[in-house]
Every structure is written in structure tokens, then in C-alpha cells.
Amino acid sequence: MCDTQGVEGPDLASLLLRVIVGVTLVAHGYNHVWGGGGLPGTARWFESIGIRPGRLHAALASGFELAGGVMLILGLLTPLAAATAVGTMAVALVANHWRNGFFIFRPGEGYEYVLMLVIVACAIGALGGGQVSLDRALGLADDLEGWAGLAVVVGLGGGGTVLLLVTCWRPPPRSAT
């Protein structure tokens, strides 16, 4: 992507975080489309947690995860790519995991995992793509890091989350236990 001479700690941190979160997002998107019940199964699951229309949102979430994951791995428009992680994982946190408590091993899976991905994605936005990124190779890195990068991630990822939840999420009634 670019010369690694002069790569410092924050650049390595960005690279490691971008790659692992990017691979995780690609795996999520792939599983939503081609794993288990495929996109129809993902759509049914979205409907079951109150995100409607399920098929549209399953396709959008899968597309955002696949594209955002690849962009993170490459370090391309890094804050925008990180915003896809914030958006998809924050929706999952609110719509599915929050009610189950913090720990992921709890029945129904708690929110610790998706919260961690949201926070790490925010950190990636603040770090920017780093020295080893397409952002750096294309001369975009200085404009897409620090407070500006964090603002993009929080603004787009958080804003998209709020918009989706307000307009498309109708939580199913909780069953009496």
C-alpha cells in the first residue's frame, strides 16, 4: 500500500485494529448472506427482533458489513468504513443484546462484544488509517484522522443508528417469564 519505513506505534495499532475488525465485519456480512439460512434467514431474524422490513435491512446490514470490512482492511476512507461497524453493531446492541445484560455468555447473549466493536471502531476513526493504508497512499490520511475522523464515525455511525431505530425498529413485546 505504501512504504512502511517510519511506521510507528499508532500506525501499527491502526493496522492491527483495522484488519481484525475488518475481517470480523466481512465474516459477519458473509454469514448473513451465505451462512445458515442465508439472506432470507437473516431477514426473518431481523423481523423477529422488530427491524422491518427484514429483507431490506438484512441486505443493507450485510452490504455495509462486507464493504466496510474490506475498506477497513485496506485503510480506505477509514472513518467511513469504521462508521459501518458502529452503525451495524450499535443497532445490534440496542435491538438485540442490551436486554440480556453485559456478559455475552448470558442467555440471549449480552452486549459486551458488540459494545467492544463499537468502541474499537470509534478508536479506529480517531487513529485514521495510519501509515500503512490507502488513505495515506492517496493523500487523504491527514484529513481523516483525529477529531475529524472520530466525528465522522460518531456522526454517521451513531446518526444512522438513531435514524434506523427511530424509523424502522418496533421491538416485539417481551414475553412474561
Q: Can you say where each PLM-predicted feature lies in the sequence?
A:
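Hydrophobic, membrane-inserted alpha-helices
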Residues: G63-I73
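Short amphipathic alpha-helical interaction patches enriched in hydrophobic/aromatic residues
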Residues: A27-Y30, G50, M71-L74
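Physicochemical signature of membrane-embedded alpha-helices that form the seven-helix bundle of GPCRs
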Residues: H57-F64, T84
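Short, amphipathic, aromatic/basic-enriched membrane-interface segments that mark the entry/exit
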Residues: I49-A59
